[in-house]
């Protein structure tokens, strides 16, 4: 199975399945001498961790990360960093009834078509459980970017179902179980989630992630454009069906005179481009959005087939998130951090001596 690695100079390779013994990853390219402890990684893992509120899956995994290699006496050595998280709360018996049944909307059918077999326990490798390791690796990148370059990466929920959420107050994001920046909408989200739980259904969501302090010049035209790599990274997250950079699909309705980000001696006058022009960072905030589908793991009966081609009715058992977009916030932050760190290292490797007299803001 290929496709388990992302990045060139900062490389992250993950392994493990939802109901396997453990999840793990190898992180290559971390410069030596960076202070790093397991506590540095645990904060973001706790934000993603299941079972932390009544609005997410009640699978209770502590997600305690272990650093196996690449760190000595509290600092990185420059060698590969090995990370491990043990699975402790598997209930594989919940999935015995779907051993021969393809859950509609899941990867069951496509995995078996590709590999001729599948791990039916919680989706195996296709499960979002895998993203725990991305968050751990991303925490390394976030720490490096923040401490060495002052780059801050933040994410939040900006829509759930038909409820739009304005970014009114970033300080509120960590104060509620929805990662919601709009405190006036908390009650509406709570009401929606209660209704979904009662109905046994699920809902989609939109997540926004923002990087501030990113220097101009990151990105490698033409096939490794910064926005292309960000889109690639975010699209690789489970349930993501669309990614926008800046104004995204809204630019369809704009005219060139409206969409262009005009420049004065005081800097850019707008940021429709989301901080990326020609595939290269402009020095403005990088803004990306991703749309997540409603999970198909619901108790509403649906039609499907089994591996023998027979039509059957399907009701998903097990413990699942009614809105996967909630816990996707720290995952999106991690993936953006991984991409930015990779491109920052690539920029330093090729263009460390480049100096210009062009203004920067």
Curated annotation (Swiss-Prot):
Q: Entry's InterPro entries? A: Chorismate_synth, Chorismate_synth_AroC_sf, Chorismate_synthase_CS
Q: Enumerate the UniProt keywords alphabetically.
A: Amino-acid biosynthesis, Aromatic amino acid biosynthesis, FAD, Flavoprotein, FMN, Lyase, NADP
A GO term for molecular function: FMN binding
- Pathway recorded for this protein: Metabolic intermediate biosynthesis; chorismate biosynthesis; chorismate from D-erythrose 4-phosphate and phosphoenolpyruvate: step 7/7
Q: Which cofactor does the UniProt annotation name?
A: FMNH2
Q: How is its activity regulated?
A: Competitively inhibited by 6R-6-fluoro-EPSP.
Cofactor: binding details: Reduced FMN (FMNH(2)). It can also use FAD, however FMN is the preferred cofactor.
Q: Might you give the EC number(s) for this enzyme?
A: 4.2.3.5
- For the ligand (NADP(+)), the binding residues are 48, 54
Question: What is the catalytic activity of this protein?
Answer: 5-O-(1-carboxyvinyl)-3-phosphoshikimate = chorismate + phosphate
What is recorded on activity versus pH?
Optimum pH is between 7.5 and 8.
Function, as annotated, reads: This reaction introduces a second double bond into the aromatic ring system. It uses NADPH to reduce FMN.
Binding partners and assembly? Homotetramer.
Task: Report the family membership.
Answer: Belongs to the chorismate synthase family.
Q: State what protein this is by name.
A: Chorismate synthase
Q: Specify the species.
A: Escherichia coli (strain K12)
* Upper taxonomic lineage: Bacteria, Pseudomonadati, Pseudomonadota, Gammaproteobacteria, Enterobacterales
